[in-house]
Amino acid sequence: MLVETYDPFQHLAVSAFVAAIPILLLLLCLTVFKMQGIQAALLTLLVTFFIAGLVFHLPFGESIGSIVQGVVQGLWPIGYIIVMAVWLYKIAVASGKFAVLRGSIIGISRDQRIQLLLIGFCFNAFLEGAAGFGVPIAICAVLLVSLGFKPLQAAMLCLIANGASGAFGAIGIPVGIIDTLGLEGQVTSMDVSMMTALTLPMINFTIPFLLIWLMDSWKGIKEILPAILVTSSVYTVSQALITIFIGPELADIIPSLLTMGLLALFLKRWQPRNTFLLNGNGCESEHASLKDVIKAWSPFYLLTMFVFLWSLPAFKGLLAEGGALEFAKWAFVVPGSSIEVGVDFIGATGTAILLAAVTTVTTTKMIRMKESISLLKKVIVDFSIPIMMICAIIGIAKLMTYGGLTMALGEAVATTGAFFPFLSPILGWIGVFMTGSVVNNNTLFAPIQTTAGAIIGTNPSLLVAANTAGGVMAKLVSPQSIAIATAAVGETGNEAALTKMTLKYSFGLLVFVSVWTYILSLLF
């Protein structure tokens, strides 16, 4: 890590304040000045460039190299994964598979508390893992409204449910991005993934209970307690095992599929004595044959299979130095700098999703390759601005890391000493509330967390996991999430009402994560 100086003023408090200007500016642009995300990110990138060069004395060539590295990593693998994941989802919708898939879930039980577990929790988590970026909140909220839920109630429930899966959205990008940051102590995404098995399970286990309590109070919990226990236990345990032994990429997809499957089997033998129907009305789903249901789920079976193959050590060995596929990696040093930029064409998770998408199209009669290419073009256009924003934010993070700004901030927050682990999730909460993204939050704050961890002697991976967990709790109230949810259920203009509904649960979960992180810091 190239750092000329992290204390140019020979006064840590002043140096840290100047180092914090890029983060403060980005947050002010997004909240006070109401600038578009891309405009705020580009302005902040420009200001960071001047601060890193003029104040922290990062050489011009290294500054340019930092930005180039950030932009390339924002495009590949991050942007690549986003585009491929959303494209696969669009293919499933256009081919009619998604409608059958949706019906297969609704048809499991007429009890709408059970439907909330299946759609609001399990399917929400599945879509978060497969697509992310607001897709699960929008789709699941609309589905619940179609079943008779009140619009704002449906939006609130989906936002809260997303707290169990937001850490691993879009094939695990929020944690996977750790590998692109070059963190203090060589912290990797796998290190953080394993640590989330300690920070997240209690939240994951609690959320299904909270959802049913919000819908039907303690009476609802008592009446469908067996179903809640199946949902909470299977999802929590399976996600913990996957984050420990496989990694972040499938940490939403496999647990949600497994939970839906086992809950469906359980409900064949058990149903609540009293069928709970909102307003006394249920929503009947169209019957589909088992063959059609299996076909409908096929894009996501393929996705799971290919991503799992890509995560195997044997496959990664093919891409390592001396491996048969080593040629597929491309790297270069940015001219005028010492900073290396690399692109892994085959090993990127996006390539696994690409294969799932192409296989789906070639084996489905309802959609042709030409139509799927048109969908891909539209996805690229629709997500070009968000991806550009991610590129700019990674560029900011790289400048701050190479320029010493991150080290200055880390040294400053480390002055809180052993109390810092309690504050760690709060940093993450602030990051997601302001940027609307766990990806951007980890990009900005993970370097600060690891630097502080190294200074105070706390496991840096624990602090990054806490940063992630705290950030996920902010998704319940971040303006971006609220806007998506209200728009999806036709309640645009009622953002304040929805925020008021979710705010206390966001704060409550954040306090729990902070206390739990502090306890864990005493043990690890």
From Swiss-Prot:
Disulfide bonds: none annotated. It is found in: Cell membrane. GO terms for cellular component: plasma membrane. It is a multi-pass membrane protein. One of its GO terms (molecular function) is lactate transmembrane transporter activity. The chain crosses the membrane at residues 12-34, 38-60, 67-89, 127-149, 156-178, 193-215, 224-246, 250-267, 297-319, 339-361, 374-396, 411-433, 505-522. Keywords: Cell membrane, Membrane, Transmembrane, Transmembrane helix, Transport. Coiled coil: none annotated. May play a role in L-lactate transport. Belongs to the lactate permease family. This is L-lactate permease. It comes from Halalkalibacterium halodurans (strain ATCC BAA-125 / DSM 18197 / FERM 7344 / JCM 9153 / C-125) (Bacillus halodurans).
